[in-house]
Amino acid sequence: MLSPFFKSISTAAVITFFATSVCASDKMKVVTTFTVLADMAMNVAGDAADVVSITKPGAEIHGYEPTPQDIVRASDADLILWNGMNLELWFEQFFSNMKDVPSAILTNGIIPISISAGSYEGKPNPHAWMGLNNALIYIDNIVMAFSNQDPENASVYKANADAYKQELRATIEPLRAAIARIPEDRRWLVTCEGAFSYLARDFGMKELYLWPMNADQMGTPQQVRAVIDGVKDNDIPVVFCESTVNTAPAEQVARETGAAYGGVLYVDSLSGPDGEVPTYLDLLRVTSQTVAIGLTSASN
């Protein structure tokens, strides 16, 4: 059953949708659930489609609350792209109002890493875009969804995707090499949310985090104590936190262990055009460089 909130925004959307005149456009209109997917999709689309994100730059996407304007925009789309793997729990109810709008789940075909603790234990870690091989699958799924919906431009989407994949590989491989130069016993990634499991796996790093998902309990005394113990036991030199949450728990871990606080990592959301990570490739580059610099500096 829909909540009163979703009933109200659904009604508002229908009224607004039929009352508003929309400028005609030959381009396919694509809506994504968050900015990382939007940037991937824009790179595949080029000039052949218009892509927008429901959530804004810098938004915390796990607990997002859709607005009436969001459902209007999505109702007018030719295609909706979403991540799946329990990331956009808000979107599943949101999308139930738009069964006639084609959609694609971009994690199809990805082998997930399971969450190891908390109320989401055993479920897939949804942050699969943080792994290079997974990102290539996302891009292929976007090409497939675009081509099915807009077959006339299928060759354009394929060519754009091939170029984007080359750019992605060129961005990641030097970063992977920088991490590989760090001594293996120092190659730990300690973060607030367990959102970096795919990055840690691909870079040959061990992982420790305060909480598994931002939708779960965040920064409890028990979580902080467990990570403090883990940092001390493994002589981990640096801890990080991501951009969309309170960094205080990670900073407490650093203070109580003598580890360095290495700064902010990006995962769930891009920044605005003037920010640090306006694109997905920037997000991967800045996050990986921050990790490499933090571990290298702390290890010297």
Which role fits each region the language model picked out?
Residues 1-10:
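Bacterial N-terminal signal peptides that target proteins for export
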Residues 24-300:
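Extracytoplasmic metal-acquisition and chelation regions
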